[in-house]
Amino acid sequence: MVISLEYKWIAMSNVLISSLMGTINMSIVLIALPAIFNGIHINPLNSFQYLLWILMGYGLVTATLLLSFGRLSDMYGRVKMFRLGFLIFTFASILLYLTPSTGDAGALEIIIFRVVQAVGSALLMANSAAIITDAFPSTERGKALGINTVAIMSGMFLGLILGGILAVFNWRYVFLVSVPFGLIGTIWSYYKLKELSVKAVKTGLDIWGNLTFLVGITLLLVGVTYGLIPYGSSPMGWSNPWVIASMIIGLISLIMFPIVESRVESPMFRLDLFKNRSFAYANIAGLLSALGRGGMMFMLILLLQGIWLPLHGYSYSSTPFWAGIYMLPLTAGIIIMGPISGILSDKYGPRWIATGGMIIVTIAFLVLASLPYNFTFIEFALALFLMGIGGGMFGSPNSASIMNSVPPEDRGVASGMMYTIMNTSFTASMAIFFTIVIVGLTQRFPVAMTASLANIGAAQLSPILSNISPTAALFSAFLGFNPVSSILSALPAPLAAMIPHSTFNTLTGTTWFPSTLANAFIPSLQTSFYIGAILSAIAAVLSALRGGKYVHGDEILKTDSNNGLKPQEVETEE
C-alpha cells in the first residue's frame, strides 16, 4: 500500500496527542498530590497506601494489559483499539474530575478511576509505536519515534507546570485538563486514521498466559508496595505475612509465565521474537535502562521538595511547583536529542548511538551521586542535562531497533512487549528505589533526629519527634510539607508552652527539618544512583551487542546455487 506524505503526519499527530495526554496526566498527578489529598480531606501521614496506589496503580494496570492489548490489536486492528483507548481515557478523566466523595471513599474512587484511565492508556500505548511504524518507511522511523519521544517528555514537563498552577485553584482541574486532549484525539482518530496493518491470524486468547502474568506482576508489585508501609511496630512491612505471601506467589507465577508461553498455541508474549538478535538485546537493554532511570525522577523530586528547595528559602507549599521547574534541564536534554538521535539512527543504525546514550546516562548517575545535598543549581542542572541527552540518544533509536526487527503483522504485539517491559521496569524501579531509601532512613533517621535536637538544645523533644517514622518523613518530603509542624501543633498546650519560642521557630522553619532529613537521606540516595549507574553501564554493553543495522523486510537478491535468485533478509554492518 502506498502511504501519502500527508497521511504519515496525520498518523503522527494522532499519536502525539495520545502521548501528550498520557504523560501530562502522569506528571500532573505527581505534582498535584498535596492539593488532591487536601481536597478530599485525607491526612497523608496516615494514608501512605493511598498515595502509593495513586502513584503506582496506574503503571501497574498499564503494564499488565499491554501484552494482551498488543496481541488483540494485531488480530482486530490497531486503529480500532487506539480509538477505543482515547474513548476510555477521556471517560475516566471526566469521572476523576467529578469524584463525588471525600475521605477514604474519595481516595478509593480516585484509585478506581485511575485504573479505568490506565486501561485506556494501555490501549493507546500498545498501538502508538506500531501505528507510527506502519505509517513511516524504515528510513524515517527513527526520526518519527524521536518526535514522539519529544512529545512524551514535553508532556511530562507540561504536566509538572500545569499541576503546580491548576492545583492552586482546584485539584479537580488537574484531571479536567486531559478531557480536551481526549475529545480531540477521539474525533481526529475516528475520521482520519486508517487501518494499514497486516492483521495477524485470529486465534484464541492466551488465557493461561494472561492469568500467570497478571497474577505474577500484580502480586509482586503489591507485595513491594505494602512492604514500604509500616507494619505493627516495624517501620516497614516486610514482616507482614500478606506481603511475604504476595511476593512468593508473584515470583512463582512469573517463573511459570515463560514456561506457559512456550507451550500455548498462541502466546501473548512471543518468546520466538527473542531469537532475533536486534529485538532481544534492544529489549533487555531497555529493561535495564528503565530499571535504572524509572525511580530516578521520584528520587530527584524528593531531594528537591524535601531538602534543597526548603534550604534555599522556598515555602513547603510551593516546592511541588518549583521542583517541576528545576527538573527542566532533564526534559531539555531529551527534547534536544530525541529527534536528532532518531535521524542519525535512520542513517547509521541504532547500535552506537543508543550505546553512547547509556554511557552518558552512566556518567550522569555518577555525577549525581557525587553531589552534596546543598549543591549549586549549575552542578545539578548539568547532571540532569547529561541524563536527558543520554536518555534522548537511547530512547528513539532503541525503539526503532525493536519495531524494525519484526514483521508488519507482529508490530502490535512487539509494541506491547516493548512497553510492557518498559512500564513494568519503571514501576518496579520506583518500588526498588523507595525500598533502598526507606531501609537507609530506618537505620539513620532516628539517630539524625536525636543529634539535630541536641544541637539546638531541644533534646527533651527527642522521645516525641524521634517517633516520626522514616516512611512519614519520606512522604512528607514528597508531598512538600514539614511533619514537625503537624506534630508540634498537636501537642497539649502545657507541653507546647514549655518549648522556647526561638526553638519552636527553628523546628518549624524551612531549614532545620530538611537538614536533619538530608543527613539520613543522602547516603541512601547515593546508593540508588550507584545502582542506576551499574544498570545503565550493563545496558550500554547489551546495546553494543545488538548487532548492525537491521530492518525486517529489507531484502536483497542473492544467488542461490540451487534455486537461482531468491530474496533474503540481511543484517548490514555499521
What are these regions (language model features)?
Residues 65, 77-88, 93-96, 100-112, ...:
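C-terminal module of multi-pass small-molecule transporters
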Residues 12-59, 241, 253, 263-399, ...:
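Transmembrane core module of solute transporters
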Residues 169-284, 292:
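Hydrophobic transmembrane-helix bundles of small-molecule transporters
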Residues 2-191, 341, 368-369, 380:
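Transmembrane-helix bundle of Major Facilitator Superfamily
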Residues 8-15, 82, 110, 205, ...:
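Hydrophobic alpha-helix/TM-entry signal in multi-pass membrane transporters
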Residues 36-37, 72-73, 162-170, 224, ...:
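Interfacial helix-cap and linker-helix signal at transmembrane-aqueous boundaries
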Residues 18, 147-151, 205, 285, ...:
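Hydrophobic alpha-helical segments of secondary membrane carriers
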Residues 1-15, 23, 278, 346-349, ...:
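Transmembrane-helix exit segments and adjacent C-terminal regions of multi-pass membrane proteins
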